[in-house]
């Protein structure tokens, strides 16, 4: 989730999207602002000073459409499935000699935020039939 934490939709972007859907009277589009406001409020409490709503799922789907805009590395990873302090956390092993019990996965380290932002805005500011 570290990379997806940076896939931010800012309040200014949300206002622009909402104004567009109000002007076009797009009822489906009008659900976007309340949804993103909900996430922004949640993340503002858990991460004060965050600049907007992280779009974890959006950036994951966006990556499938734009694999050239994301930098990946193959890294041995273990997910902690057991209850306790590490529950749900992923441990990436960056050492040269790794634990053979860790499976290797692709991890995203960087993505083209400006391109992501442009694509999000082009998608949400498109008039539907």
Question: For each predicted feature, which ranges?
Answer:
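N-terminal acidic, glycine/proline-rich low-complexity segments
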Residues: 1-129
């Amino acid at each position: 989730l570290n990379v997806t934490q940076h896939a931010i939709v800012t309040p200014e972007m949300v206002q622009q999207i909402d104004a567009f859907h109000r002007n076009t009277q797009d009822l489906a589009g009008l659900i976007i602002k309340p949804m993103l406001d909900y996430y922004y409020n949640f993340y503002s409490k858990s991460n004060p000073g965050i600049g907007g709503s992280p779009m974890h799922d959006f950036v994951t789907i966006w990556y499938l459409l734009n694999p050239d805009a994301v930098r990946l590395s193959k890294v041995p990873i273990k997910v902690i499935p057991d209850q306790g302090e590490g529950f749900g956390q992923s441990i990436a092993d960056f050492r040269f000699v790794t634990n053979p019990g860790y499976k290797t996965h692709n991890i995203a380290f960087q993505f083209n935020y400006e391109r992501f932002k442009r694509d999000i805005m082009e998608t949400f500011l498109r008039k539907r039939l």
